[in-house]
Regions:
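Conserved RNase H-like, two-metal-ion catalytic cores of nucleic-acid enzymes
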Residues: 1-52
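Metal-dependent phosphoesterase core characteristic of DEDDh/y 3'-5' exonuclease domains
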Residues: 13-16, 25-28, 54-155, 159-175
Length: 175
């Protein structure tokens, strides 16, 4: 159980990849992945980028961002002796001050019991799923620790980020 679940628990996990993307005013997408075996180095690069973003009028976007990505990133930064950037909500951040769009939260429509996987949301809003490669979320841990497939994990993360942009665009286009 530990081996399967530790990757999802910030106190035991190791961040090896963070992918970010920016949608420019002209609609172009600029994507960047920070990855490597040295977690501190990966987090330091992400911290530097998010520090710059926090000074601008950016929103963080993700699927289960508020309940997974943000706490995971912040806790892993603290564990690695790094200060989480101010754009990441903290214990004293008021709900209306959180600059984040969470597609899982949007799709749940206030329900805490609904299933909200990114794959399911893709199917419901007719956006092609990124889950077409050999890596899936449930095997990222073994793909890294046993198979040394960092490159494939980065590709998996990048696909998730790009499909998230497609979902947000689709939701914004609803009439």
């Amino acid at each position: 159980v530990f081996e399967k679940r530790a990757a999802l628990v910030p106190e035991f996990a190791k961040i090896i990849c963070v992918t970010v993307a920016f949608v420019l005013d002209n609609g172009d997408v600029k994507k960047q992945s920070f990855s490597g075996k040295d977690e501190h180095d990966v987090l330091k690069q992400v911290q530097k980028l998010l520090d710059r973003c926090g000074k601008l009028d950016f929103y963080l976007c993700g699927h289960n961002l508020k309940n997974f990505d943000i706490p995971m990133l912040a806790k892993r930064m603290i564990i690695n002796d790094l200060m989480p950037p101010s754009i990441l909500p903290s214990y004293d951040t008021k709900p209306w001050e959180i600059k984040a769009i969470d597609t899982k939260e949007i799709w749940q429509y206030g329900s805490y019991t609904s299933i909200g996987s990114l794959d399911l949301l893709c199917a419901c809003v007719d956006v092609p799923t990124p889950k077409d490669g050999e890596i899936t979320g449930d095997i990222v841990h073994s793909s890294y620790w046993y198979d040394d497939k960092l490159k494939e994990i980065v590709e998996y993360c990048e696909k998730d980020v790009l499909v998230l942009i497609d979902i947000i665009k689709k939701l914004k286009e609803l009439k």
